[in-house]
Amino acid sequence: EAYFEVDKQKESFIVKTSFGEVEVLGTSFNVKAYNEEAFITTLERGSVSFTSLTGKKAILKPGSQVVYNSNNFFTRKVDTEIFTSWKDGKLIFRDEPLQNMITRLERWYNVDIKLEDERIKNLKYTGTIEMESFSEVLELIKATTPIEYSFDRKTRVLTISAP
């Protein structure tokens, strides 16, 4: 995942990924291209075009996003701050399932998180997490979500369960 701020220039700025290319002429945008996940480009300001490897093309306007997965893609309006706040040391969640939160926390804190109870994976969370210590973040989530957890510092594995 990378965030770009590109000044206007005569030559195009192109970000190439295994999913396709994002072409820019002066803009701020985020590119999320993890293996086995949908490719997502989120535009804060300016203009970008996305061309998939199969030649499909989308032009984004500020406040929009292209999502590309399995040779299909769509665009949508989004709150860009949710997708770009990581660059400012925060993670923002709006009615986010616990399962999705886990993916973002695993990447940020370089840990493995295991859910012991399938019933809690769809618990919804709304909030902003400033990038504090991992233990402070866990206590915040525990205080606002009905979960229990244990963390093995040696293996860096967090196990989350229902209370």
Task: Kindly give the residue locations of the regions a language model identified.
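A residue-level detector for the "anchor" residue at the start of short, highly conserved motifs
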Residues: E1-P163
